[in-house]
């Protein structure tokens, strides 16, 4: 979908509602960097306990504790106010010197809203992204989007879309009485990308991208409908009217 993946140094915003697969995608992004490219990574979280993250990752076959022992991975559990007070520098500098990370995932930027005024959130996020870029790190930033409808969701309301290079939207959707997961690339700065809305599954090995929702429209609005059947009914109604 990304024609080769995220570009080095990119800031990627992953937006989605609870249970849409954001954390799994973030962990898989870090693990792939470590295993496939030898790029150490940091997972910084404001909401989950370490044991839960280690356990969830192990379910996919990702041994984060072993990666930490090999100095390839760090898990940082902290609070948003500590990150804001240090502007990211004091909190991360020591780890950066020890690990020389190339990737970081932050779960999630949404928690900063509780500690800063709405008008200041964009400024603080910009400061954090700029700091990570100066360290030569690619960042994946999670955002709890709540109710998403089309391309309009709460990320744009606080003005974060302009400061990131890529936006990935995830959403669970109900189609024919079954819940499916949808993924779309809304923005990719400086590179071509797949613009189709695609299904994905969370498998025992992580996230697997499936085929596009080619027979449906309105998936991201929450009101999906089968395109083929609608066109057939229109043609059928048209033919019936002509016979009259």
PLM feature spans:
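Walker A/P-loop NTP-binding active-site region of P-loop NTPases
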Residues: 1-64
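Scaffold/interface architecture of coatomer-like assemblies
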Residues: 3, 16-18, 25, 141, ...
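Short glycine-/polar-rich loops that comprise or flank the Walker A/P-loop
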Residues: 9, 37-40, 71-73, 136-137, ...
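Hydrophobic/aromatic beta-strand patches that form the interior of the parallel beta-sheet core
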Residues: 12, 42-44, 74-76, 140, ...
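Conserved inter-motif catalytic segment of the P-loop NTP-binding fold
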Residues: 37-123
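Conserved nucleotide-binding/hydrolysis micro-motifs of P-loop NTPases
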Residues: 47-51, 59, 79-84, 110-112, ...
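P-loop NTPase motor core
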Residues: 84-167, 175-179
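Conserved P-loop NTPase
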Residues: 97-100, 166, 171-242
